[in-house]
Design a protein with these regions (language model features):
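OB-fold (S1/OB) nucleic-acid-binding surfaces
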Residues: 101-107, 165-172
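Glycine/charge-rich catalytic "coupling/switch" loops of P-loop NTPases
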Residues: 107-154, 171-175
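ABC-family nucleotide-binding domains
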Residues: 10
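Short aromatic-glycine-enriched beta-strand elements
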Residues: 96-99, 159-164
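Catalytic Walker B motif of ABC-type/P-loop ATPase nucleotide-binding domains
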Residues: 1-4
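Internal alpha/beta loop-helix hairpins
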Residues: 26, 36-106
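Helical segment within the ABC ATPase nucleotide-binding domain
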Residues: 15-28
Length: 177
């Protein structure tokens, strides 16, 4: 049982220690119950998660499934709602430190100079960082633009709505006003 084991560490040290915790589980097959409020830590090391809210289990299952459930979109907090997408590093541009991450709906380009081609990982795209357009944007500095189909719209709270967009079979959430 690891109950918030990295809570006292600064962000840089957390990212140094997390691979070692992940390696213990993978190399030795030792099950770890890892308690955390950090979505980033969970994405780095967990395969299965149990979401506890209000003193009870709200959801359990594979990390991607739990964190992509529409009814739990806000479980991470309003500013952290988003999509978890499994990707594979398929290209690296060392001159610029840009990695190409492929998924069912296309390719993300992100700054990630330490990735290795072939490496599989999960990324989280915050819903508040996803813009929607009726036409393909031009003359913008945005690296990641995808075509998709609006699959659903649901009320958030306040002036926002959550929009699910199907991008090649992958659901990506957007939170718009």
């Amino acid at each position: 049982l690891m109950d918030e084991p990295l809570a006292a560490l600064d962000a840089e040290r957390k990212w140094e220690v997390l691979p070692f915790i992940d390696r213990i589980q993978r190399d030795f097959g030792t099950p770890i119950v890892y308690v955390s409020h950090s979505i980033e830590e969970i994405l780095q090391i967990a395969d299965t998660m149990v979401l506890i809210a209000g003193g009870g289990v709200s959801a359990a299952g594979p990390v991607e499934e739990v964190l992509n459930r529409p009814d739990l979109l806000r479980a991470a907090g309003d500013g952290n709602a988003g999509s978890v997408i499994p990707v594979q590093a398929t290209g690296l541009d060392p001159a610029y430190g840009i990695a190409t991450l492929s998924f069912a709906g296309g390719e993300f380009r992100v700054t990630a100079p330490d990735l290795t081609v072939g490496e599989r990982l999960r990324i989280r795209v915050r819903a508040r960082d996803v813009s929607l357009a009726t036409e393909r944007p031009q003359h913008v500095s945005v690296l990641n633009v995808f075509e998709g189909t609006v699959a659903g719209v649901s009320s958030a709270h306040g002036p926002q709505v959550d929009v699910s967009v199907d991008v090649g079979g992958t659901m990506i959430w957007s939170q718009i006003t």
